């Protein structure tokens, strides 16, 4: 049995294959996922697992350089936005870097998911609970 925190074989495989600047998406239950992009569906029911739970586990094994959010999250889901920024700040401190965060429209966000290595779907059912994580390097 794998000893690390991340036990899901599909998620672990995607993270292990990431190169510098490759992207993965962690999303809520409603984000449309492009047919050509690998879909890893972790959603069991509404709210299980949460977006932040999935983000927390994935980022324990992924070196993150930057993150992309839909600009709508700021007004439409401010509580989750604050929690997400806090989690990214804490991750950056743990990694020894500053994770840059950029914002694009939700339409542009959906288009950008086509360029991701995978989309990991959570059971989150709150608006704009989505992030594109851009891989960094550990050296």
UniProtKB/Swiss-Prot annotation:
It is found in: Cytoplasm. Keywords: Carbohydrate metabolism, Cytoplasm, Isomerase. GO terms for biological process: D-ribose catabolic process. Substrate binds at residues 28, 106, 128-130. The active site is at residue 20. Belongs to the RbsD / FucU family. RbsD subfamily. PANTHER family: D-RIBOSE PYRANASE. Catalyzes the interconversion of beta-pyran and beta-furan forms of D-ribose. HAMAP family: D_rib_pyranase. This is D-ribose pyranase. It comes from Serratia proteamaculans (strain 568).
């Amino acid at each position: 049995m794998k000893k690390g925190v991340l036990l899901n074989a599909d998620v672990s495989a995607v993270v292990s294959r990431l190169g510098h600047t490759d992207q993965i998406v962690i999303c809520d239950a409603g984000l449309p996922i492009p047919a050509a992009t690998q879909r890893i569906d972790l959603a069991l029911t509404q709210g299980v697992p949460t977006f932040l739970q999935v983000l927390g586990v994935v980022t324990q094994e992924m070196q993150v350089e930057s993150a992309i959010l839909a600009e709508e999250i700021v007004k439409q889901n401010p509580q989750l936005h604050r929690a997400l920024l806090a989690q990214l700040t804490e991750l950056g401190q743990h990694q020894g870097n500053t994770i840059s965060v950029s914002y694009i429209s939700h339409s542009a966000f959906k288009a950008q998911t086509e360029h991701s290595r995978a989309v990991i779907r959570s059971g989150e059912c709150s608006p704009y609970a989505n992030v594109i994580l851009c891989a960094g390097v550990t050296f």
